[in-house]
């Protein structure tokens, strides 16, 4: 059986490729990338690498040719064409190439999420369902790495109230994705997440790592914005950060699920140990 991974040169993709090679062998793995030269530098020498650009459906059809299962890693917004157009190209190409199964990295509760961040994922899930391709939606919660700025041993200031997040390591999500890809018994939807924790919980874990007390202070969104402006962040970045904080405050990342641990076959890394992995300690 031939397996493909799109966007394979990204960090998530690289971890997924390594995990997949370990499970099925290099001969059965195809990495699909936009930049072949970059891929040759980042990916194992013994796997097949094919060029496939989300902006070019025909290149994707060729890249998917002969593949049985594909891990479709969602793109980042802000490209030459919209992310939804890119994703439409991918789904159309999967169907045209007669791929039998696709695992798609989606957004928490994409079928009911209110955040603007979810809209492309909601639409992509709909496209995949309508394509008739057997699928699993991997609704990844939040990477702990996204909070790297809060893991430096300084006090934490945030604007998310008591909102909780299902933090887990990016590699844990990637490893879970590959486990689903190779499974013969899959669910249509996985809500992948770690245990739900708030920023006070995060501060306690950071305190344990550094051996000193780390305080967590919740502030109003307007005050948080002022702090970000003083830190020299640009308007777009500030807007995105505030959107994430509001997303958390509204409870959209609160999740009680064991899907990720169940798929991995073991408990997720304890939060203090996961923090050490992120900061390289």
Where are these regions (language model features)?
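Short, functionally important structural connectors and interaction interfaces within domains
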Residues: 46, 157-160, 240, 255
């Amino acid at each position: 059986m031939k397996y493909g991974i799109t966007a394979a040169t990204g960090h998530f993709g690289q971890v997924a490729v390594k995990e997949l090679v370990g499970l099925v062998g290099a001969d059965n793995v195809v990495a699909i990338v936009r930049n072949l030269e970059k891929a040759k530098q980042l990916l194992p020498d013994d796997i097949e690498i094919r060029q496939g650009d989300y902006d070019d459906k025909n290149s994707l059809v060729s890249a998917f040719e002969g593949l049985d299962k594909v891990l479709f890693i969602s793109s980042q917004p802000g490209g030459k064409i919209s992310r939804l157009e890119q994703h439409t190209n991918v789904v159309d190409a999967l169907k045209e190439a007669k791929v039998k199964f696709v695992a798609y990295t989606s957004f928490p509760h994409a079928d009911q999420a209110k955040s603007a961040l979810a809209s492309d994922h909601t639409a992509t899930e709909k496209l995949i369902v309508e394509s008739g391709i057997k699928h699993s939606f991997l609704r990844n919660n939040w990477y702990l790495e996204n909070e790297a700025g809060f893991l430096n041993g300084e006090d934490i200031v945030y604007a998310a109230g008591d909102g909780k997040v299902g933090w887990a390591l990016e590699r844990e999500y990637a490893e879970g994705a590959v486990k689903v890809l190779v499974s013969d018994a899959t669910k249509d939807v996985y809500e992948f997440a770690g245990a739900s924790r708030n920023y006070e919980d995060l501060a306690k874990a950071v305190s344990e790592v550094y051996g000193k007390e780390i305080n967590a202070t919740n502030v109003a969104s307007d005050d948080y914005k002022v702090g970000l402006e003083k830190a020299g962040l640009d308007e777009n970045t500030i807007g995105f950060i505030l959107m994430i904080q509001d997303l958390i405050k509204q409870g959209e990342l609160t999740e009680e699920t064991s899907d990720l641990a169940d798929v991995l076959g073991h408990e997720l890394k304890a939060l203090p140990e996961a923090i050490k992995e992120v900061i390289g300690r």
